A protein has these predicted regions:
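Bacterial N-terminal signal peptides that target proteins for export
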Residues: 2-13
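Charged, low-complexity intrinsically disordered segments
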Residues: 27-164
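Bacterial N-terminal signal peptides
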Residues: 12-23
Length: 164
């Protein structure tokens, strides 16, 4: 009997640990140098779109290459110096989830290589999700567990990268 209680306790601890790892959206992103998706060529995040504009004006707007910031090894473009300053004050709040990698692709695989379309996006619970097409972006509103699956896959991917 003691053995099965121990097993049960270990299961509870494992599930609790997984919940803390995934975080249910409450955790900060685990981003490191080199995690930002800059496409196959160049070093520009979000194909040059202003990550702050998604939050402040609710639109995908192309940033000005003359108004930029460097963060985590990527160059970020902005439509105004005000947006750049907001980003630099708290980049994790404005950076897209999963380093800008395709969010719905991340929900299905830990090694996403899908191109993104910065015009295919959603802000859900204060977090920016970028997808590869409008239909996929809209799925984040309609398929409840996509974000949880993507968060779990991102955690696995980050753990895998850290152990390499």
């Amino acid at each position: 009997m003691t053995h099965s209680i121990f097993k049960s306790g270990r299961l509870i601890l494992s599930v609790t640990g997984l919940a803390l790892l995934i975080g249910g959206g409450a955790r900060a992103q685990n981003l490191r140098e080199g995690d930002i998706d800059t496409g196959y060529f160049g070093n520009v995040a979000l194909e040059g779109y202003d990550t702050v504009a998604y939050f402040t004006v609710g639109q995908a707007l192309v940033g000005d290459p003359g108004i930029k910031a460097d963060w985590l090894g990527a160059e970020w473009h902005f439509t105004s110096t005000g947006n750049r300053d907001l980003f630099l004050a708290n980049p994790v709040s404005y950076a897209p989830q999963y380093g800008g990698h395709c969010a719905d692709g991340m929900a299905y695989d830990t090694n996403v290589q899908t191109n993104i379309d910065p015009k295919s996006w959603r802000v859900i619970n204060g977090k920016l999700y970028i997808s590869y097409d409008p239909v996929s972006a809209s799925e984040f509103d309609t398929i409840p567990d996509l974000i949880e699956r993507a968060d779990a896959n991102w955690a696995v991917r980050q753990a895998s990268v850290a152990s390499d």
